Amino acid sequence: MPEKGTVVMSRYELGRSLGHGTFSKVYQARSLVSGETVAVKVIDKEKALRAGAGMVDQIEREVAVMRLVGRHPNVVRLHEVMASRSKIYFVMELVRGGELLARLVAGGGRLGEDAARRYFHQLVAAVDFCHSRGVYHRDLKPENLLVDDDGSGGGGNLKVTDFGLSALSASRRHDGLLHTTCGTPSYVAPEIIGDKGYDGATADVWSCGVILFLLLAGYLPFFDSNLMEMYKKITNGEFKVPDWFTPDARSLISRLLDPNPTTRITIDELVKHPWFKKGHTKRPASSNTMKLNEEEKPANAAMNMKPASLNAFDIISLSQGFDLSGMFCCHGHSSRTQDQLFVTGKPATAIVSRLEEIAETEHFTVKKKQKKRQEEDGMAVKLQGWKEGRKGQLAIDAEIFEVSPSCYVVEVKKTAGDTLEYQAFCNRDLRPSLNDICWTSPATAASEKNQLPAVSEVSPLSSPRN
């Protein structure tokens, strides 16, 4: 492993060690470009590869998951991933306050109810956000909860980390359940112990219940020196609530630690519980959500009304890596993960007309961003949803580029609203409606059936190209 003072990838200077695992070590580091202080997780590639495909999958899954959920204020953010011939580097947000568990110990073993409630609010907000992205943590425990030091004296803010054991919704089997047994014994849900398949969301809720109990009581609800006895207590939901728990706290804990996953409280029910509602304020919409009443910037009057032309370098930059076959389909993605690419031989006027038809049937209004000129429709349109979604109304831009007189690329991107709702619209409505006018390569058609979120254009575990 590198030593203090080492400069990695000509970008970050490593500082003191913050911790280590079997295959990795975490350092405080400084960006040589911005001067920002970050945390860098250094993974030994050779050791990870020797550990087998499971470790490789875990590392790649962690990258994919952190990119899905890392913009939430209560989730540790992944800035970038780099790789050399021997090492993989995760550059992450530095959380200066350390583990929540250390703060718990320093406070005498347990927290006051108001402090515990504040951290629990933030934990639930992060977990709910992850679930909305189809991500289930599966290893929630105080060691994986960090607290930043915001300098306000208010105790800092919670940050969820370590997504190495997380599952994506695509990991479910045909029965709609997860089947991989994982997690830390004291925090694991009874249905995971039973190995009969489980719902990732309800399993995470159980772990949240164990964490809340620990924060309020100062000890775990389920503990025994004999692991099988402890599992028996977990399976039966056998625990005792301390005398100092308030009635509302007792009520919530009993719902969280319900051994029956079908009757266990859900997050939607949890946020309405009297104990949780005290002092809880709904988080404002994300700052990157566009204001819907914001006027469109006027198009440049000198702009050519024909579709913008793309040269070979533009096409390569829009495709996945250098495999252009991924473009000629109704399932392409640009290098920006939220953008969708469609390639067609139909003229721009036909494309715009089809988008207008989709908008009319799917509760969108259409605003053309360029006006008609000599039988050519505008080459960019905005689809504005009028239904309220998770993050307001969905807004989508579609821009048409001319590759040749018989080949057009349509780039579709979200400008406002929730990412998952946008992806659902693309999968359920947009692609099927464009299928008959788009080109599809045989390779892409075959792979569409089992599509997973891309981790990166080139896996950090793959060998560098010569």
Swiss-Prot record:
Coiled-coil boundaries: none
Keywords, sorted A to Z: ATP-binding, Kinase, Manganese, Nucleotide-binding, Serine/threonine-protein kinase, Transferase
Induction info: By drought stress and abscisic acid (ABA).
Enzyme class of the recorded protein, top EC level: transferase
Keyword Kinase: yes
CDD domains: CIPK_C
Transmembrane feature ranges: none
GTP-binding as UniProt keyword: no
Cofactor(s) needed: Mn(2+)
Annotated region (Activation loop), positions in chain: 162-191
EC number: 2.7.11.1
Record region (PPI): 337-366
Biological process terms in GO annotation: signal transduction
Catalytic activity field: L-seryl-[protein] + ATP = O-phospho-L-seryl-[protein] + ADP + H(+); L-threonyl-[protein] + ATP = O-phospho-L-threonyl-[protein] + ADP + H(+)
Domain NAF positions: 297-329
Region listing for Disordered, in residue ranges: 446-466
Pfam families per UniProt: NAF, Pkinase
A GO molecular-function descriptor: ATP binding
Binding-site positions, ATP: 18-26, 41
Active site per UniProt: 139
Occurrences of domain Protein kinase (ranges): 12-276
Function: CIPK serine-threonine protein kinases interact with CBL proteins. Binding of a CBL protein to the regulatory NAF domain of CIPK protein lead to the activation of the kinase in a calcium-dependent manner.
Family, per entry: Belongs to the protein kinase superfamily. CAMK Ser/Thr protein kinase family. SNF1 subfamily.
Domain remark text: The activation loop within the kinase domain is the target of phosphorylation/activation by upstream protein kinases. The PPI motif mediates the interaction with the ABI (abscisic acid-insensitive) phosphatases.
Protein name in UniProt: CBL-interacting protein kinase 20
Organism encoding this protein: Oryza sativa subsp. japonica (Rice)
